[in-house]
């Protein structure tokens, strides 16, 4: 059995992002790029399954749509434990385009399980995984919080209101995973980092796919209001702040 994990290259959540050209373009200057956290959890679970001899997983591959400057993120996935990687050589523009490129690459190799994070931490679209499944004609399970393999059969657990749902899914299939699929992402050890330098990254030229959406503008969030400490025995100051600063009350004298 072979597993492929789709990964995204996203800004670290601690990075202060900036926009240019009247908020129509993302400025990558100084940005620290990382594996999308949801995809990292998917990779962790895939590696756990590979290490479980009873699961019968022979290899774990990661696939990514991006240009050459995204390869450090791919190398991190290899350092964590992936056996090899595929990079589709195209700048990701929208979910449809990314899913189409991933599906085309997957068609060329016989993978049994395709895993995707439920969303990316930058755009939060939650659509790539289901689109990949549709392009491939594979069954898919969304919001998967558990995945085991018993006697060659995949068993997936989903969190639902009031309990859990357990499904048996025939291979090949797409699992769109969320929190719970793994306890925490793995940290690359020094040995893994050294080995990642020589692990193969297969570069594939993209197929012709037109994005279905167009980015119009970014809108940064409003700055957070300042925090003002007020003594509990000073109700007059509290009223003044609520009236003049927060502007949530109106006081008549």
Model-derived regions: residue spans:
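N-terminal glycine-rich FAD/FM-binding segment characteristic of electron-transfer flavoproteins
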Residues: 1-253
């Amino acid at each position: 059995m072979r597993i492929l994990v789709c990964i995204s290259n996203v800004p670290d959540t601690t990075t202060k992002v900036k926009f240019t050209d009247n908020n129509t373009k993302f400025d990558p200057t100084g940005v620290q790029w990382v594996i999308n956290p949801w995809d990292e959890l998917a990779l962790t679970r895939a590696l756990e399954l590979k290490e479980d001899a009873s699961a019968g997983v022979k290899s774990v591959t990661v696939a990514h749509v991006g240009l050459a400057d995204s390869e450090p993120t791919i190398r991190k996935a290899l350092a964590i434990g992936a056996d090899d990687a595929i990079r589709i050589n195209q700048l990701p523009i929208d979910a449809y385009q990314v899913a189409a490129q991933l599906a085309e690459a997957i068609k060329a190799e016989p993978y049994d399980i395709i895993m995707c994070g439920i969303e990316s931490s930058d755009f939060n679209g939650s659509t790539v995984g289901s689109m990949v499944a549709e392009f491939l004609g594979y069954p898919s399970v969304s919001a998967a919080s558990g995945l085991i393999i018993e006697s060659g059969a995949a068993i997936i657990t989903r969190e639902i209101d009031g309990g859990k749902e357990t499904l048996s899914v025939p291979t090949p299939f797409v699992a769109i995973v969320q929190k719970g699929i793994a306890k925490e992402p793995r940290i690359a050890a020094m040995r893994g980092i050294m080995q990642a330098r020589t692990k193969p990254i297969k570069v594939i030229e993209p197929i012709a796919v037109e994005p279905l959406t167009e980015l119009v503008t970014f809108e940064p969030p409003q700055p957070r209001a300042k925090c003002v400490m007020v003594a509990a025995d000073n109700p007059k100051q509290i009223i003044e702040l609520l009236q003049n600063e927060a502007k949530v009350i109106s006081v008549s004298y």
